[in-house]
């Protein structure tokens, strides 16, 4: 990780305290401390040991050679929260941790409420970092549900209590998050608690939330210690979920760990296959990561993807409030195996590049294959994707679409897919806040990755695009990103400017 000077670290740390309150709103007060305090005196670099999978940015593709692009949706937001944790402390995250699609999908966009399970929309506008290119924004939204419409829940909390979890930004924060989630559930919802370290323990059998005191007492009793050798931890969690399966309900494992994924299945392929088998039986898996230094990001993402789930990185109280309170409906899938396919018109588009989604690209023939796994969309959740496109030299005033946007999804696992289709036209001279904000977030991600495709993107461009897109910001997360950028240290600003100049 890139070293930042002592004074820069202190300034950034002060911003961390002011921008993210660590005093819990949960009445139980399980978490008492500030994340930054766990690092003590300024250090040469953030804790080492985090593991990421390197990848190469998607390239431009000639429409004459391949006019069709297919990818699975990705509703995770872990990459953005991980970046925020590093940048707010004066450091840069590993570029392999920066996944632009997760930056985009951390935020909710102002998309129309769909009549059915999913709605789609799109627009085309100018590309801020290349005046000769256009940007195509794709949007999807899962149908919102009210509190009364939430499905009955059967949750299994699978908690890592190994010694590595014994720091303020790990187990205490996780306990506070789970206590907060319990307060949000309905009296007839069910919660189980399984822990693992040197051994596996079913600390709490499935219990209705009307007995919240019993559930909370079990959560408060959690303490960290011992090695991480999980035995049959994840298998036990799945068996617990199946034993209390609610037909037509939200059956889900919520796993909290610092990322050392030793849960009893040591072979990666065996683990992924097991998770897939249980996913096919209707058990979803939500991964929640905490802390740094032991972080196996690549495994966490793969497992959550195969488990029909979500992947979050929780670095502060505001983040667990986002995940378990403000966006709790996102834990209820309304669309399964959701795929997008874009077919470009070669008379209007010469080349295109999908920004992000590198590990979610699919073969074109997989789009119509209902046996192929893809991502889920939660209730009220929005998904955003961007293509940078190179227009042809001959542009026509004829009403010819730039592309056709097809989306396939299943309302329930095991059912046949439904398909939505939208022809994409565009007025290049106009844009919307949705497009400007998406462009700003993508440009920031490309700067952090020092992408060869960043063009003229720079920090001031990013701040201008985001700052002009704040009218729709119901929970203040867009403003939070702008505040982060405005409080970067001089060293961080200089580094971003150096990357922009290359």
Summary of predicted features, one role per range:
Residues 35-75, 79-97, 111-122, 129-136, ...:
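An acidic, Ser/Thr-enriched
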Residues 21-42:
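Low-complexity, Pro/Ser/Thr
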Residues 21-27, 118-338, 392-397, 412, ...:
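Exposed acidic/Ser/Thr-rich ligand/metal-binding surfaces
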Residues 31-35, 96-102, 153, 215-217, ...:
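A broad, low-specificity signal for short, low-complexity segments enriched in glycine/proline
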Residues 102-112:
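Short, structured protein-protein interaction patches enriched in aromatics and acidic/basic residues
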Residues 11-12:
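Repetitive helical segments and hydrophobic/amphipathic motifs
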Residues 1-6:
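Positively charged n-region of N-terminal signal peptides that target proteins for export
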Residues 16-19:
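C-terminal motif of bacterial Sec signal peptides marking the signal peptidase cleavage site
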